[in-house]
Amino acid sequence: MKSHIMDSKSTKKRDLSKYFLPDIRQARKRIKKADIIKDGFEIPANIINYGEGKTYHIKTFGCQSNLRDTEVMMGMLELIGYEYNEDVNTSDLVLLNTCAVREHAESKVFADIGILDRIKKSNPNFIFGVCGCMAQEEAVVNRILKSNFNVDFIFGTHNVHRILNLLEQVIFEKNLVVEVWSHEGNVIENLPSKRTNNLKGFVNVMYGCDKFCTYCIVPMTRGKIRSRRKEDILDEVHQMISEGYKEVTLIGQNVNSYGIDFDNGENYLFNNLLEDVAKTGIERVRFTTSNPWNFTRSIVDTMKKYPNIMPHIHLPIQSGDETILKKMNRPMKIGDYIDLVDYIRANIPNCSITTDLIVGFPNETKEQFNKTLELYKRIEFDNAFTFIYSKRDGTVAAIIPDEIPLSEKKERLQELNEMVKTFSKKNNEKYVNKVLDVLVDGPSKKDKTVISGYSPQWKVVNFTGSAKSGEIVKVLITSASRFTLNGKMID
C-alpha cells in the first residue's frame, strides 16, 4: 500500500485533501473477519543497514497494548541497526506512541510534538513520528497537519508492522508520510520485538473491542475483536520460558472476549486459553483487562485450579449506578457484579480485586455518585484507578449536554479518592504478619538498600534481605501502607 505523501517544503498551508486521513465513521464499521498473516513483515532492501551508527527513542503513553506495540517497533528498528537511546535530545529518530483515552494524555503529546518540532528545526536530519491511538483520530491528525509541525510520519495502530516501509519513504522521498488505516487490521504474527523486561512480559491474546461504551474511543482506535490462534500464543509463551521469563501477562482490550470471534463451533474461550497457558509451567500467569459482563465463573474456576495463575483480577465497573451504566452502554447489573465478586472471594479467598471508576459522567447526579461510594464500601476494592469523565470526540457521550460544573466533579473525585486510600490501606494491613511469595524485581527505585518485587496479589513488596532479580522468595510482612507492603526475607 502506497502511503499518502506530500512535499513538506512545498507550502506552508497544507492541502489536507491529499492525505489519507483517519475516518471515525469508517472506524466504527466491522467489515470482515480478520486474516492471520504469518509472513507480513520484511525489511525493505534500501534500508537494511540504515540505522547503523544511529539511535532511536520511543516515548510510550497509555496501556499495556501500547507498551507491547512499542516493543515490536523497537525490535524492527534494531534489525536495521538502530540502538536505543534514553535521551530524546540526542536521538536520531524519535517516535511518540500515543494514547487517546483521556484529554490529559493528548495534551502531553502535543507538548512533546512542539519540543520535537524545535529539535527538527535545528537539526534537519532528525526524524520524528507520531503513532498509536491518537493517530487514529481525525481531529488529532488534522490538528497536527494544520499546525505545520515538521513531523515526518504519522501512522496508526493497525499498521505497526509497516514502520520500516514508512521510514523508507521518509528517508528517500523527503516527504511527510501519513498512513492511517481506519478499518481494523489483520493479525500479524512472527513480528520481531525487543522486550523491555527480561523477567516479566506481555503477550497479546486479542486485539480490539466491540463493546462500544459510549465514553470510549478504543473501539474506533483499536478496531474490532481479533483473537490470536492459541497455537501462536502458546508458542510465544514457550519461547519466553526458554529465555528465562518468570511471569507472563495476557493482554487485550477485553481479554475475556477472547475466542468469541472464532468460527462457529470452535468453542475455545478465554478460560480454555488461560488453562493451557498455566499448563506451560511458567511460574506466574496474569491477565488484563477484563470486562465484568463477559467474566464467566469458569474463569474463576480455572484460576482456583492452577496455583501459577496469580490471584488478582482487574474488574472495571466504572459506576455504581445502573442508570449511569446504561448511559455508558455497559449492561451490568450491580447485583450481578456483587455476586461475581462474592463468587471470586468464596473460591479464591486471597484474591485481590481492583477496578476503574469514572466520576462526573454527563449529568451524573449526586445521588448517582453516592451509589458508586456505596458499591465501593460493599466491595472494599484493593485499589481503583479513578478519573473525571473525559470527553472524546467521535463517541456517543461526547454529544450529551453536561450541566455539572468541573469544580463539582473534582470534589467528587477527591471524595472517592479518600475512600480508595482508606480501603487500600485496610486491605494491605491484612497481610501484616503473613508470609508472601515475592518475585524479585531488584533494588527499590526509591531506596537502593531495599529490595522490591511483587506478591501474587499484585502488591508492591519492599523488603530487606539478600535476593537476586528473578528469584521468588518468601517475605514476612511487617508493616503496610496504602501503596506498599514492607517486610523481611525469611529462609
UniProtKB/Swiss-Prot annotation:
Protein name, entry field: tRNA-2-methylthio-N(6)-dimethylallyladenosine synthase
Subunit: Monomer.
Enzyme Commission number: 2.8.4.3
InterPro entries recorded: Elp3/MiaA/NifB-like_rSAM, Methylthiotransferase, Methylthiotransferase_CS, Methylthiotransferase_N, Methylthiotransferase_N_sf, MiaB_methiolase, rSAM, rSAM_horseshoe
Matching NCBIfam families: miaB-methiolase (TIGR01574), MiaB/RimO family radical SAM methylthiotransferase (TIGR00089)
Catalytic activity: N(6)-dimethylallyladenosine(37) in tRNA + (sulfur carrier)-SH + AH2 + 2 S-adenosyl-L-methionine = 2-methylsulfanyl-N(6)-dimethylallyladenosine(37) in tRNA + (sulfur carrier)-H + 5'-deoxyadenosine + L-methionine + A + S-adenosyl-L-homocysteine + 2 H(+)
Keywords in alphabetical order: 4Fe-4S, Cytoplasm, Iron, Iron-sulfur, Metal-binding, S-adenosyl-L-methionine, Transferase, tRNA processing
Function per UniProt: Catalyzes the methylthiolation of N6-(dimethylallyl)adenosine (i(6)A), leading to the formation of 2-methylthio-N6-(dimethylallyl)adenosine (ms(2)i(6)A) at position 37 in tRNAs that read codons beginning with uridine.
Domain TRAM, residue spans: 429-491
Pfam families found in the cross-reference section: Radical_SAM (PF04055), TRAM (PF01938), UPF0004 (PF00919)
Binding site for [4Fe-4S] cluster 2: C209, C213, C216
Gene3D superfamilies noted in UniProt: Methylthiotransferase, N-terminal domain, tm_1862 like domain
Principal location listed in the UniProt entry: cytoplasm
Record-annotated MTTase N-terminal domain positions: 54-172
Residue ranges of every copy of the Radical SAM core domain listed in the record: 195-426
GN (gene name): miaB
Taxonomic lineage of the native organism: Bacteria, Bacillati, Mycoplasmatota, Mycoplasmoidales, Mycoplasmoidaceae
Annotated Gene Ontology cellular component terms: cytosol
